[in-house]
């Protein structure tokens, strides 16, 4: 029964209220903020639960009156009231179901985005650069701050790979669904015959992770230093300032060469490594949770095509939600909300189907 799912809410709130009175908790600001967030979240559900129960009570009362009422006019008025109450009940029930879709603890975090050129050679690298510009322009519109961490540029100005940070309110919540393979269809500037080509780039969106959020053993790291290189592979630094870090247990490799100092490059590489390891562990947990439903959550949505950008038709197709918008130019200029808002709604509806409450 729907209300049975909500029954433990009040006892959980009482436990959190007791925790919040603990003076030791207040000293630990990070843990205190976490408990406050959970408390506010449960209070929001309780508020809707109380509202829902009140509506149910009104429906029961009106149905009882209707069964005893003999006046036809009064009966009609009661029926109208019942219709209104049932609509209200459905609305509140839907709101509660959305709230019960577990809130992502990373939603308020800053992010690191990694974009890599896939199939398509130079054209794929140019498209990777286009995606980077799309996200930075979107960030400007949102008043978010972006910072370039690392990039490997081609001779024509494309990116073989690029990593950058975005800081702001609910950045991860807004952009977390961007992870995956982005495909482009257009005539490349390198194509003299004017033939349409399909290329791809891979996007990974990683929540930024504090040092205290994940433990990394120094013994598990192999750190190599080398000279940084620019477009075409030529060396641009006479000192070994570039850093490559390999996490031996997982085989994850991170490199950074864009800062002039080796120390700064190591710090940036460690920041990316923490984010990747956190994502790696999170995907393993998701895979375990989704095995019963036989979903491919844990396989990493980066391995599947999520979106196609067709330049000749000015069309963007979002494959996960079966959305096509003929507004490619606006989207590439950072008007991503045209797509993201509809996508979030579709994915929310799908989540409700996959997790019936």
From Swiss-Prot:
InterPro entries: PCRF, Pep_chain_release_fac_I, Pep_chain_release_fac_I_sf, Prokaryotic/Mito_RF, RF-1
Basic and acidic residues compositional bias, start-end: 284-307
Lineage: superkingdom: Bacteria
Any one Gene Ontology cellular component term annotated for this protein: cytoplasm
Pfam families: PCRF, RF-1
Protein keywords: Cytoplasm, Methylation, Protein biosynthesis
Region (Disordered): 284-313
Gene3D superfamilies named among the record's database cross-references: 3.30.160.20, 3.30.70.1660, 6.10.140.1950
Designated name of the protein: Peptide chain release factor 1
